[in-house]
Structure formats: C-alpha cells, structure tokens
C-alpha cells in the first residue's frame, strides 16, 4: 500500500525546478498480483450547513474509513479517500473573509488527520468577476495543505462565463507566482459542465448528502486487455467486455458498501486515470502503433472514450479519457520530443476529457493568454455539453522548452510547453 496519500503529497510537497532531463524507467507496475488497477479515489459527498465544522465532517470520515477497509479486504488497493462539498458560497456566503478561511483551515486539518483530502467545490458559480479571488486563492493554498477548489466557467443557461473566466485566469497566474514552484495550481481548476458526484479532484463537488463515488487508475488493465488484440474493431470489443467484467465487480462491491452503511453509491468514473506506472499514453500507442501525437492519436482517443461512455455499469463524473501531461511518463516524454502541443491537447479534448490537465506553461504567460486557453476549454465543453476543465501550471521563471523535474513520487519530469 502507498502510505502517503496522493493528494496529501500534492498539497504538501514538490516544487518544480529546472534540471537536466532524466528519463524514467517504466518498470513493472506495483499492483497487487490479483488486480491490474487501483481505486484512485473513494469520494464522499458532504453538503454542509452554514455552521460548517468538525461535527459535519465526522460521519463522512467514518464512512470513508469503513468503505476503505471493506474494499481493501476485498483485495482492492485504495489510493485515496476524499470529501467533496457543495459549492462553497452555499455554506460560507462570506467565503473571502478571514473567518471563513479559518473555518476552511480547520476542516483541512480534520480531513488531513484522517488521511483524507477535501474539495470545496466551485467557489464562483455565476458569471461574475471577483477581483479579490486571485489573492484569496493564493492565501487559501498557503493556509491549507489538502484543499482543492474550482471556478465554473460555462453553463447551459449562460454559455461561457467570461467574467468568471477572468477570475480563474487571474488565480492561475497568482498561484503560479506565489506558491512554491507554482505547485498551488495542482489544487485549482477552471471547470465547465463538471457534474455533481464527480470523484476526481480538483473539480469534485456534491449536491446530495450521504452519497459517494469511485474513480479508478486503470491503464495497466487496458494494456492487459489489449494484449494480442489487433485492429480497432477487435480492440473496441475486447475493451468493452473486459471493462464491463472488472468494473461490474467494483460496482457490486460499492453497492454492498452502500447497503451496509446507508450511503448511496452514485457510480464509477470510468476514466482510466494514469500514474507513473500506469500510462494512458502507452495504451494509446499500443492502439496506434505510433508515438503519441502522431496521426491516429485522435482516433485512438475517440475509441477509448466511446468505450468508456458505452459501459452499462453505473458511471459518473468525466467517464472519458484523461491526458494529464505531468502525471504520465509517456505523455511527458512525447511533449519533450515536440510531438504535440497545447493546441493538440485541445483537439484531443474534442473527443475526450478532461481538457488541459496538469499542463506546464511558461511562468510569464500573461493573464489574457491563460484566459484564452481556459475560454477554449469552456467553448469545447459548451459545444459538446460535456465535462472539461483546465489545470494549467505556470512555472515560475521558466520558459518554453525548459525541463522541469518535480521532487514528487507522483509526477514525472516534463518540459514547459508553449501556452497555445
């Protein structure tokens, strides 16, 4: 088992520094012998009242302890447990005050003590520019270790939220400047059409009490399913059958946990979230027979997304394809080789998700440029009415083409990419 939780580490460690590029050896995955995937997250929904405090977190933390124990007893590796609230302003209307920040800090400490992480949901949900949001975001990251949050940048009712989008871009720039190595942006996203019940951070939020969802880390499973398979049609059929069987088992275990605890299971986010020993880039290259970024990459992304969307198990959240550049050694290496750029990631987002995820950009990228990238993500989400988000990482003092290395077991060496 991994003793230090993924989100706990991301919140507390690892500034990026420039070093000579060090390629990473992709050794055998450290998965339990009977499983070729991990449960990345069990996320519990805790809509809070205006008196947010310890007594409201404890029932959810107790549920997460039990859920984790039962899943582990069933042979599953549970990497993290998480709490997600409704949009912050619904329970802390004066969210930018020092008093509200102190409440959030206390909740962070309570969650941290239970080895859980906390998402505040979207802080800004309306289409409004909040000038103080950027400084508030930087202060929040300074005062907490495990708290994630987002801004809603598009909706069916109002289209692209260009004013809120400006607030998000200013926050991304501020976090890049004011958090060590720009690492504060790991905990923030500009999000569009991300539904309630999503287990993955930093965009997770919940609207219903006593509910939970599950997210997976499953590229190694996909590789196993594709072993010996040739051609798109055969790959599609093998993936569908293999995932239905495996995710069906997870669903049955989760439903049983819900029955025992009284917490309602919302579904599995079927997105095959990658890790350093579980590369989705490698899966795509197995499908195409060419390096990621070459022609047919888009077609492979579409195939994988189609399979995820067509599963008959109960799904939730993104349930598409994640391409987080700094969390996947193959994606990071192909970026270093110049095989794809930010515009290509936007193109791939038209057939998959989650948008622009963990993308390192120059530290001096102007706010307007950041906002333009976020607006492109919002436009795609609006056009296709699907969840997408932007988690951009301006690297302080770094320029495009420079290599960054993170002192962090969950991130790989990467190259700073041109911001569009």
Question: What kind of feature is each model-predicted range?
Answer:
Residues 1-20:
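N-terminal secretory signal peptides and thylakoid transit peptides that target proteins
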Residues 2-4, 21-35:
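C-terminal segment of N-terminal export signals and the immediately downstream linker at the start
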Residues 31-420:
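Anaerobic metallocofactor- and corrinoid-dependent redox/one-carbon enzyme cores
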């Amino acid at each position: 088992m991994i003793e230090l939780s993924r989100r706990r580490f991301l919140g507390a460690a690892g500034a990026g520094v420039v070093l000579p590029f060090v390629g990473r050896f992709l050794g055998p995955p450290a998965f339990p012998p009977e499983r070729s995937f991990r449960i990345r997250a069990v996320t519990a929904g805790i809509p809070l009242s205006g008196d947010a405090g310890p007594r409201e977190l404890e029932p959810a933390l107790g549920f997460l302890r039990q859920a984790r124990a039962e899943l582990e007893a069933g042979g599953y590796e549970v990497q993290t447990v998480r709490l997600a609230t409704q949009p912050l302003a619904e329970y802390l209307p004066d969210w930018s005050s020092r008093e509200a920040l102190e409440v959030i800090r206390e909740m962070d400490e309570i969650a941290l003590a239970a080895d859980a992480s906390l998402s505040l949901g979207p802080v800004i949900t309306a289409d409004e520019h909040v000038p103080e949001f950027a400084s508030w975001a930087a202060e929040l990251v300074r005062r907490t270790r495990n708290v994630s949050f987002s801004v809603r940048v598009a909706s069916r009712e109002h289209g692209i939220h260009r004013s809120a989008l400006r607030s998000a871009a200013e926050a991304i720039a501020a976090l890049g400047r004011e958090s060590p190595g720009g690492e504060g942006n790991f905990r923030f996203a500009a999000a569009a059409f991300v539904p309630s019940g999503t287990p993955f951070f930093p965009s997770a939020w919940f609207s219903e009490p006593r509910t939970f969802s599950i997210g997976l880390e499953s590229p190694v499973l996909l590789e196993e399913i594709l072993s010996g398979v040739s051609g798109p049609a055969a790959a599609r059929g093998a993936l569908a059958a293999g995932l239905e069987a495996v995710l069906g088992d997870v669903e049955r275990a989760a439903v049983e946990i819900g029955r025992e605890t009284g917490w309602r299971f919302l579904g599995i986010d079927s997105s095959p979230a990658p890790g350093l020993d579980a590369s989705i880039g490698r899966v795509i290259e197995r499908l195409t027979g060419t390096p990621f970024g070459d022609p047919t990459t888009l077609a492979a992304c579409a195939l994988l997304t189609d399979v995820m969307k067509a599963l008959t198990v109960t799904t939730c959240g993104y349930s598409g394809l994640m391409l987080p550049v700094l969390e996947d050694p193959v994606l990071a290496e192909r970026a270093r080789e110049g095989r794809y750029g930010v515009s290509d990631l936007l193109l791939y987002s038209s057939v998959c998700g989650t948008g622009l995820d963990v993308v390192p950009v120059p530290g001096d990228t102007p706010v307007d440029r950041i906002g333009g990238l976020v607006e492109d993500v919002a436009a795609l989400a609006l056009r296709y009415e699907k969840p997408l988000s932007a988690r951009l990482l301006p690297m302080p003092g770094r320029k495009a083409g420079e290599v960054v290395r993170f002192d962090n077991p969950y991130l790989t060496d990467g190259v700073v990419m041109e911001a569009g």
